[in-house]
Amino acid sequence: MDTAVVWFRDDLRVTDNPTLADAVAAAETVIPVYTFDPDRYTESEYGPPKTGGHRAVFRRQAVADLRASLRDRGGDLLVRSGRPATVVPELAQRAGADAVYAQTKPATEERRRAADVASALDDAGIALRQRWTHTLYHPDDLPTPPTDIDDTFTPWRKETEAAATVRDPRSAPETVPTPDGLTPGPVPTVESLGVSEPPTDDRAVLEFEGGESAGKRRVESYIWEGDHLREYKTTRNGLLGADYSSKFSPWLAAGCLSPRWLHREVERYEDERVANEDTYWLVFELAWRDFFQFQFEKYGATFFKPGGIRERNIDWDRDRALFERWADGETGVPFVDANMRELNRTGYMSNRGRQNVASFLAGVLGIDWRWGAAYFEARLIDYDVASNWGNWAYQAGVGNDSRDRYFDVRSQAERYDSDAEYITTWLPELAALPATIAHQPWQLSEAEQREYGVELGVDYPEPVVDIDARYQSL
């Protein structure tokens, strides 16, 4: 093969990237391209933009880092702005390419984009060769095909762990033979994408920087320098600080890190330092991530229906004003509000927080869970279609769980933030309150409000619902 185009999507790395590796192995010249698709920066059908400021910054950093890595190997990355179905086929035709190599993903919009590109390429007699690059287990290695897998995680995990193996990560190509004379193109600014620059906040748990280089530095810091993997399961439900959890998710979501490469790092750590339940638990969480990817392969667009894959007939509330109170962190329920304010200011929220705010929106307020999932899509720096929508459906009782479930945010706050350090970090207006009262300020008497200088409805909102009565009714 003379020329291949590599269309980068959510696989912004050179290490363990079968899309890039196969193109380099097959073609004499390789033209890598990334296109900033305007459809990813427009408003979703639920209102918020699909990509907010924090993720837009992370994405452009990741693209710039990928370009640097390719240039280190004698190649380059062409950066364009436009819909892939236009940009990629036009580039391939002008270059006289024999094939275009690209990542494949299971979600609906991602599939549609690939189909549109494939159709335009087919008209020009050019093949689209897709590679599965973003999970720990390859779908071809599963004991049961994704379309037939169990809808419950534990049976699927046990079957998969017993019968499947994780493929070895592939090395980065030593050279990428990109021809001379191409116009690389600038990496667009956040503003030119139609996105506002995100706020900065010194309370953020970590300064997330996009790119494979930064992702590997985070792995080095967390696993090797900090030696935190040995206590991962024990600390993973924390709320404050850089190292209570791995925080690898932004780099996994953008494809800056490969799950297989990360698995190899865990194995190396277990060989060189310690193997215990904590080290296994990171692989366990990667399996959870896989599970939702394969569930999307099975159910596709059904995940986006109000009743989810369980096709439940639930009359969801669509009170926009109430939803905005939740989104802005103004519900009057501190554990919910603190988490939402952290998300809005930093683009990140702990897993414990995500479960609680989702359960509160769908279970306590009864608001259409898809509004919450779309809001997370806009705000999260580590947004992944399958993980986000799969977890939201799970918490709303319409996904991969046959049980109706909810989190009691009162007891969750007391358990995971017993000293109220987290909520007072993000809700400083409650800092004068004793911890037990700070978690449930709606119980303050008028005299106590005067004593502590916290007036409900003025300094901090009254709760949007009678929280105690609502939990009694669930």
Curated annotation (Swiss-Prot):
Signal peptide: none annotated. Binds 1 FAD per subunit. Residues 2-136 form the Photolyase/cryptochrome alpha/beta domain. Residues 161-202 are annotated as: Disordered. Belongs to the DNA photolyase class-1 family. Pfam families: DNA_photolyase, FAD_binding_7. Its cofactor is FAD; (6R)-5,10-methylene-5,6,7,8-tetrahydrofolate. Keywords: Chromophore, DNA-binding, FAD, Flavoprotein, Repressor, Transcription, Transcription regulation. It comes from the Archaea. One of its GO terms (molecular function) is DNA binding. It comes from Natronomonas pharaonis (strain ATCC 35678 / DSM 2160 / CIP 103997 / JCM 8858 / NBRC 14720 / NCIMB 2260 / Gabara) (Halobacterium pharaonis). Residues 161-171 have a biased composition (Basic and acidic residues). May have a photoreceptor function. Binds DNA; probably functions as a transcriptional repressor. InterPro entries: Cry_DASH, Crypto/Photolyase_FAD-like_sf, Crypto/Photolyase_N_sf, Cryptochr/Photolyase_FAD-bd, Cryptochrome/DNA_photolyase_1, DNA_photolyase_N, Rossmann-like_a/b/a_fold. This is Cryptochrome DASH. GO terms for biological process: photoreactive repair.
